[in-house]
């Protein structure tokens, strides 16, 4: 037999298209020729494969070896094709039986000693192999994450010799156990935050509906603390969501088996580039928005971000996916993240503070806020002020109910005074959030923030008084059609938290109150 055909997987976004690895031996000058649009690391496989076979005591053929990776128009990258290429050469030379090869798919990078090294995207490849009904042989270091896929037949291979022994029937490869005992960490709790009842209420609404949220306030008022506690308010990921998020992390090479059931939380620095935020590169990799899939993306110091970087968020905030186009290829990554952002009210940060330390002129304040475009702000569902706390509130035991102290001129919140109610834990708020999300899922099969225009008409109906109030707000605040729909979705979430089937006037009024930037 001078021809052998095996199968492996490439990566294209989060998809893992099947690749046929065809090996042909012929006369001519000895050497290995790899065709089928291989990248540099794939072309280098000929040297790794030769050394690995020889060190594993196999004979490398003194003939011309042609390796074709099909389909030819799909780029192949990384060392994942080392193992199938080596097995194809061994099968074509009759050193291993070929009758079992069609049942399996193979992926793995070979060390020069014949040991197998981990590969990226094992979880995505295992999902695709299960869908096509094939068993998958992977390096032992990657098989654990692939075994998380329910009903997938995955084998953990430590070396080329072990794979050959398995195919010859002399020894069986191990079936790795999935990491099903992973539990969610509870490292932060909402009760850690003193006061800020209004901001906590907005955080609960955002968690219940999957809404985007913007905190604005002076430095040190707890904006970042509140954002960090949003994941603790969200219900646990179901298995499908966890696998989707884990597959993205696996493709990026950041998969951690112990935490695969946790909600992702990403907080990139404001100096991050557009490629770091949304993904890209010559070999497209997922960015921060995809690594936050089914989780939380926190952008601190929002006006300090490059405006061009922020503008790329507009598409994924609406669609939940990001399309990356390059001259040679196109990739698509999921990006159903929940955006939480924070900013100061002005360039110096002290506008509205009780100390009166702000000396920014109106023009300077306007220039600072204009760093964030109107279309991006229009896509943020809730905007809430996080005012400074008094020393009394900070020194008191954890308190959540507060009353606002306002100045006599503009009604700007300057500080908060503590009341007497105990602070709620994340678990208590999460229980209400879970119930509200269950109501939304039973009604429409998705969170309220993901409702499309036709679904808003069906599920966010208002009575006459509610329609009148929203119409007045639209006229007075110059709300766009998008803002109108987002206010409706927030009102639907508030009604779900209250346990109401219908949206009432108080729900609409509260939702309008969170359109703060529409009033500036």
Residue map of PLM features:
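Conserved alpha-helical scaffold flanking the Walker A/P-loop in AAA+ ATPase domains
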Residues: 204, 259, 264, 274-297, ...
